Amino acid sequence: EWAPVDLAVEAGNLAKMPVIVDFGGNNPPLSIEELFMKHLRKGDIYTHTYTLLEGNVRETVVDTATNKVKSFIWDAKKRGIIFDVGYGGASFNFTQAIPSLKAGFFPNTISTDLHTGSMNASMKDQLSVMSKFLLMGMPLPEVIRASTWAPAQVIQHEELGNLSVGGIADIAILNLREGDFG
């Protein structure tokens, strides 16, 4: 059952790159604790961190009985596993995100997982996902970092995601406004 993950990690070793794992769909679900502690390396990426899929096809980061982040999730983060949002169409659930953020468990990277099935749902674009994390209590500097510099570092392209002399210019000027916009 672990062969696809192990082969991906082996390819990552050969390429000297992290792997990103979209994990789930096994019946019964494989353990994410085992994934983090026995299969992934420091710097490997776990996406769809805050998902809660129907049918119990993927283990969650928050224990649904206690509403607390599972202890091994904290251990995995300390070990260097990168936790990515990967918002997508069905890959994000506030019942996982809110308790996580309240406990101080912020994602390392914020991404959209934009595809034809997700672009016309609650996730429109990167800024809408960033706004949700800001509103859930993630500090603005951390939201910006998790959307720019942190992903560039994770994928080993430090010429991206920052403002520096000689850096690649990809700049957005944002205005933080309060109000009712829905």
Can you annotate each of these PLM segments?
Residues 1-83, 91-108:
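Histidine/acidic residue-rich metal-binding segments in metalloenzymes
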Residues 51, 88, 114:
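Active-site metal-binding loops of divalent metal-dependent hydrolases
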Residues 82, 88, 134-135:
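C-terminal amphipathic alpha-helical segment
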Residues 93-176:
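His/Asp/Glu-enriched, well-ordered alpha-helical/loop segment
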Residues 178-182:
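Short, Lys/Arg- and Gly-enriched loop/turn segments at beta-strand edges
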